[in-house]
Design a protein with these regions (language model features):
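Solvent-exposed edge beta-strands and adjacent loop segments
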Residues: 10-89, 137-152
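N-terminal export/ancillary region detector
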Residues: 1-10
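Extracellular/virion structural assembly segments
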Residues: 3, 64-140, 149-154, 165-167
């Protein structure tokens, strides 16, 4: 059985794009079901409708140039498998008891993470927002609270979230 579903090539895009993350949004994983989002016909992988009526979204503003969102693809030729490992490394400046309490709650909760990038969709001009953990959720599995040493050092948190997705 041949698996030749490749449909097109890709040229070079314009060279005026920006990296980085502007905002991180969290939603509790259990608060909305698979039926709450939809793809338009022919746009698998690009969600155009999400019903957040039963879910609250929490927005975190992150310092410029500090937060990353990425996915690592892992495949096995021997097993015929491919899966994705989404990871978000998020920085929050300043140690506070309020943040410490929220971080504790984030660590106890499986979440979906939406990362608003410093990029815009070339056809529409809309901000690019990617979702990580859409099907299986994300968990905070590491982090640090760092006071810094010198006056100019960062005082704050680094939080690491990861997940595992089949697509």
């Amino acid at each position: 059985m041949a698996c030749t579903a490749l449909t097109k090539g890709r040229g070079l895009d314009c060279n005026r794009i920006s990296g980085g993350v502007k905002f991180i949004y969290f939603s509790v994983y259990d608060d909305f079901a698979r039926t709450d989002w939809a793809y338009s016909s022919g746009t698998e992988g690009e969600i155009d409708t999400i019903n957040f009526q039963t879910s609250t979204i929490y927005r975190y503003t992150v310092p410029r140039g500090s937060t990353t969102a990425n996915e690592t693809l892992t495949g096995s030729t021997e097993n015929g498998t491919l899966f994705y490992n989404p990871v978000v490394n998020m920085v929050l400046n300043r140690l506070t008891k309020e943040d410490q309490n929220q971080i504790k709650l984030l660590g106890q909760t499986q979440v979906r993470i939406f990362a608003q990038l410093n990029a815009t969709h070339s056809a529409t001009g809309n901000d690019v927002i990617i979702c990580l953990g859409m099907h299986n959720g994300m968990s905070m599995n590491a982090g640090t609270a760092d006071s810094g040493a010198a006056f100019g050092d960062r005082n704050g948190y680094t939080l690491n979230f990861d997940g595992l997705e089949a697509q």
